[in-house]
Amino acid sequence: MTAPNEKLADSLAALQVLQKGGQRVFQSKDLDRLHRERLLRNGFVQEVMKGWLISSSPSAREGDSTPWYASFWEFCARYCQERFGDDWHLSPEQSLLLHAENTVIPTQVVIYTPRGTNNVVKLLSGTSIYDLKQPDMPPAADVVVRDGLRLYSPAAALVKVPEAFFNRYPIESQVALTSIGDPSDVLRRLLDGGHSVVAGRLAGAFRRIGRPEVADEIVAAMKGADFTVRETDPFAAQQTFGTLRPATAPIVGRMQAMWQAMREPVMAVFPKMPGLPKDRGEYLKFVDEIYKSDAYHSLSIEGYSVTPELIDRVRAGGWDPDHHDDDRKNRDALAARGYWQAFQAVKASVSEIIAGANPGTLTRGAHRDWYRELFQPCVAAGLLRAGALAGYRNDAVYLRTSRYVPPRWEAVRDAMPALFDLMEHENEPGVRAVLGHWMFGYIHPYPDGNGRMARFLMNAMLASGGYPWTVVRVEDRNGYLSALDSASIDLNIEPFAKFIAERVQWSMKHQGDAAKNAGRA
């Protein structure tokens, strides 16, 4: 008789065949009944709806949306292809959001298709697909395929989206408008369709974001074809725009637009800058003193079980993986040792920053050293391959339970230099600290350690204004993560800015008290 573990191994082997190439979505018919039931029972797959499965993990908690969000767009692509063949595409609104690197999982995806039934298909975690019946498919030139999803091209989508889109999604609209290098693609569709009202709207939009030459070209071409055009501005009056260079990579344009939009809300709540410390030794002494608290809270936020005693042992050099198996194998001890090593590297960077180095320029290279120190103990212990220290991720990552999905790994190579450009040219240390922290997590450039790295970066940026090293406490974890989610999903930075500002104010008071006590001594 075959043992249960052998049966499960056979089922996992069948699943592995289907997962080749990174596939996470399958039809039930792809697995025979016994394999399917066994994998469902053991949590290795999850049912989305009748006939469809996604890869899951036995360790996923009940109600955990992470496996679903990780599979969402692949499911949409495979389900629609199976049901509609090539006769479908996403709505112009969703197409533009994806072109503008808005990676938030929507609660509902609208599919345009001649084979639609105007029905809602309910999916997991409160999401759904709505198949909107359309008389015809758009011209082939209007549709592009990306990761299996059939999207309107940016030019076609801009002509199709309603005026309300520009008001609701100003950042995505600016990124999409900026992606249009030459206006010919947009003009051709406006002229062929006789879209004089849309032409006026797009002319107003291009002029508002700082591209008057495109606006003038649209108006002149439409009038030359005997259309009456009245230019209108579709954006809200209070919306402000920085200048983006045409044909900028969408992720870079998005980051620049978000940074510009979020600067003022951060400055409105952040405490006054103390200025670079006169006594750099005293500043660094405070950094040393706060290490124990910082390590405990930062590691605990990430789910490590780290005690103050373990932190003290690591700091005192009592961690010895060469002679103690427990130290070599203990995940928490390895994390604590890596944090100690990285903290020393960050402190060295802070020392240069308070001496006057440009923090954006310095951390552009130094953050790679921090990361290597953070995970070097895990590599030395054999828990990670040496390649883990190579640099940025080359695969997708997902945030547990969050509808926000970090950018595609291909976009990280453009995003990270852009982040350091923004910090390099930013004059306000508080803005560098808050937006640097949030945007590092938004990009999520590494396979692991992004939260710790973001907090290190925040403290390096705080140092550039003379603010003290600031600890995010584990007891504030839920509010902290909720504020980050609000910024990433709703582009509302205010909760996160207020959260960090309050922690910085506490740290300033604590540093001041420590200085007074030292003076009495």
Regions found by a protein language model. Give the residues of each.
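FIC/Doc superfamily catalytic core
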Residues: 1-33, 40-50, 56, 60-521
